């Protein structure tokens, strides 16, 4: 059962258009499945890439208060909402809200190569998500991506993933389904490219 405070926050996010229509309880269940897929170790450092209305980030914050968590989003209205939600849910200082373009933040020392894991519910297509996330991950970090229900082996080509610095890919069948990518090495200094270049010329 979800806390009334968390449900109230997510209902507010839905009213504001930060999350889509649908059952809030279903959204919470899906966010919890992110945690099950990731199995974060105690006291590790994670980020929610493109946190939006706080899925899965706010659920992770409530369910796993030991985890240091950064909620990253480029929209000032969404990060303003997330800041209020973090205060209301009393999950600070373990949870920080970061406003900015992920492709720019990933080149800053504060964020580059420092996270044990990255959650991605709906950040972007696989190529964009993989290219942005690898720069945030420490070696042996994991990227957890929400997947569509039907398998498509073309979504995550291993050759291109290895060129970015990933070592392994596992599909968690669920349901719900997730892709788990493990980082091996730090990417080249130009990774990630700007969002314009990533979307116009995806790596795969």
Label each region the model flagged:
Residues 91-102:
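Conserved SAM-binding strand-loop segment of SAM-dependent methyltransferases
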Residues 155-204:
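SAM/dcSAM-binding transferase cores
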Residues 140-150:
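Conserved beta-strand signature within the Rossmann-like core of class I S-adenosyl-L-methionine
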Residues 1-47, 77, 84-90:
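Class I SAM-dependent transferase core
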Residues 128-142:
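A short glycine-rich, Lys/Arg-flanked "PGG" loop and its adjoining helix->strand segment in the class I
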Residues 68-73:
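Conserved SAM-binding motif I beta-strand of class I
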Residues 53-66:
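Conserved SAM-binding loop of SAM-dependent methyltransferases across substrates and taxa
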Residues 103, 107-117:
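A short acidic, Gly/Pro-enriched loop at the edge of an enzyme's catalytic core
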């Amino acid at each position: 059962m979800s806390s009334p405070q968390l449900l109230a926050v997510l209902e507010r996010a839905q009213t504001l258009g930060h999350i889509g229509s649908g059952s809030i309880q279903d959204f919470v269940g899906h966010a919890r499945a992110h945690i099950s897929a990731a199995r974060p170790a105690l006291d590790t450092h994670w980020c929610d890439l493109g946190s939006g209305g706080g899925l899965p980030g706010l659920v992770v914050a409530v369910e796993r208060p030991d985890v240091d968590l950064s909620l990253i989003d480029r929209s000032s209205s969404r990060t303003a909402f997330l800041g209020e939600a973090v205060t209301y849910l009393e999950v600070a200082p373990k949870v920080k809200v970061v406003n900015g373009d992920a492709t720019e933040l990933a080149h800053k020392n504060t964020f580059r190569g420092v996270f044990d894991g990255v959650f991605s519910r709906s950040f972007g297509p696989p190529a964009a998500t993989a290219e942005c996330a690898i720069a945030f991950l420490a070696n042996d970090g994991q990227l957890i991506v929400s997947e569509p229900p039907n398998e498509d082996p073309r979504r995550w080509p291993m050759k291109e993933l290895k060129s970015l610095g990933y070592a392994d890919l596992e599909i968690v069948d669920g349901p719900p389904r997730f892709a788990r990518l493990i980082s091996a090495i730090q990417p080249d200094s130009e990774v990630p490219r700007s969002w314009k270049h990533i979307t116009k010329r995806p790596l795969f």
